[in-house]
Curated annotation (Swiss-Prot):
Residues 174-176 are annotated as: G5. GTP binds at residues 19-26, 81-85, 136-139. One of its GO terms (molecular function) is GTPase activity. Residues 19-26 are annotated as: G1. One of its GO terms (cellular component) is cytosol. This is Elongation factor Tu. Monomer. It comes from Cellulophaga lytica (Cytophaga lytica). Keywords: Cytoplasm, Elongation factor, GTP-binding, Hydrolase, Magnesium, Metal-binding, Nucleotide-binding, Protein biosynthesis. The gene is tuf. Its EC number is 3.6.5.3. The lineage of its organism: Bacteria, Pseudomonadati, Bacteroidota, Flavobacteriia, Flavobacteriales. Belongs to the TRAFAC class translation factor GTPase superfamily. Classic translation factor GTPase family. EF-Tu/EF-1A subfamily.
Length: 395
């Protein structure tokens, strides 16, 4: 089935499969595309094509990820599946694949395992709002009581990490059975997708959020004034809108948008995702620089101290060869600029090894516009040594 036949009028969501190694995430991903393809809603993707995940580079980090897409009767989904546990950690922490919701796969034969817990924790840390559970391999469990026990364990685990373990859907089935076309199990995959449709909420679109654009470059147009260029991250820029310009420790500037330029044409507006030049009233070129943000007045404040969930690259990934200790001072590449900051490790953690992921506290030398969920890279001498995202603003 050709790509073009997808109905783009359906609301779009990004989801993914998470869970312990060998519990059937990739088999389930293949089963979903197969079952929906047979219902005329998707194109078929074989297990092998998903399992041989291509390498991607995101913020200087190599991650193996498979992307599949499919539709249900109500929605269009982009779905990510990662072959290895380390790929999941990197994917979730760096936000290479932003997820609006996740399908947690738990093998009924095993019950929740260490990575089950770790993926739920990561989901909580990186703000995946809702999780649907697929209890897999139930065809290999004869004992009905055991199934109930596993479901109860999973629900308790979700509740422990502040997900709605009591009300969230848990669907029992067999991904392999569905992939092989056994009707009983095909039905469970359809039931799963119905649960995903109903339980995972549509995210707020970037366009509907407050306006924010990180400044990439600044120049002067004779007779028109100062222009700041960049890619609009969220919201809409309209000619005539008042804006704040928030910078690296400097006092905030107030201005008005006098024009939005795109592909050398003057427009009335620009929206999230557009690369634009914004004309600013009463601002000198010397007052703005790369790394500042232009935003809706009062919507963003500069902060210098925050908690973050980070992944530190292994040596083989181009990261550090040695561990680092408390008060390590790298650069934090946020949006369009580097800012030096000091890392404080959690109590009881003496040092951080390449390949670790953990929660750290960061204090930047100068305050910059920050919000929860914002992603960044950690750099040292111009090379990326880690990546993460802000989980909590402290001050």
């Amino acid at each position: 089935m050709a790509k073009e036949t997808f109905d783009r009028s359906k609301p779009h969501l990004n989801i993914g499969t998470i869970g312990h190694v060998d519990h059937g995430k990739t088999t389930l991903t293949a089963a979903i595309t197969t079952v929906l393809a047979n219902a005329g809603l998707s194109e078929l993707r074989s297990f092998d094509s998903i399992d041989n995940a291509p390498e991607e580079k995101e913020r200087g980090i190599t991650i193996n990820t498979s992307h599949v897409e499919y539709s249900t009767a109500n929605r269009h989904y982009a779905h990510v599946d990662c072959p290895g546990h380390a790929d999941y950690v990197k994917n979730m922490v760096t936000g290479a694949a932003q997820m609006d919701g996740a399908i947690l796969v738990v093998a009924a034969t095993d019950g929740p395992m260490p990575q089950t817990r770790e993926h739920i924790l990561l989901g909580r840390q990186v703000g995946i709002p809702r999780i649907v559970v697929f209890l897999n391999k139930v065809d290999m469990v004869d004992d009905e009581e055991l199934l109930e026990l596993v479901e109860m364990e999973v629900r308790e685990l979700l509740s422990f990490y502040e997900y709605d373990g009591d009300n969230g859907p848990v669907v029992s089935g067999s991904a392999l059975g569905a992939l092989n076309g056994e009707q009983k199990w095909v039905d469970t995959v359809m039931e799963l997708m119905e649960a995903v449709d109903n339980w995972i909420e549509l995210p707020k679109r970037d366009v509907d959020k407050d306006f924010l654009m990180p400044v990439e470059d600044v120049f002067t147009i004779t007779g028109r004034g100062t222009v700041a260029t960049g890619r609009i991250e969220t919201g809409v820029a309209n000619t005539g809108d008042a804006v704040d310009i928030i910078g690296m420790g400097a006092d905030k500037l107030a201005s008005t948008i006098t024009g939005v330029e795109m592909f050398r044409k003057i427009l009335d507006r620009g929206e999230a995702g557009d690369n634009v030049g914004i004309l600013l009233r009463g601002i000198e070129k010397s007052q703005i620089s790369r790394g500042m943000v232009i935003c809706k007045p009062g919507s963003v404040k500069p902060h210098s101290k925050f908690e973050a969930e980070v992944y530190i690259l292994k040596k083989e990934e181009g990261g550090r060869h040695t561990p680092f200790h408390n008060n390590y001072r790298p650069q934090f590449y946020v949006r369009t600029t580097d800012v030096t900051g000091t890392i404080s490790l959690p109590s009881g953690v003496e040092m951080v090894m390449p390949g670790d992921n953990l929660t750290i506290t960061v204090e930047l030398l100068s305050p910059i516009a920050l919000s929860e969920g914002l992603r960044f890279a950690i750099r040292e001498g111009g090379r990326t040594v880690g990546a993460g995202q802000v989980t909590k603003i402290i001050e």
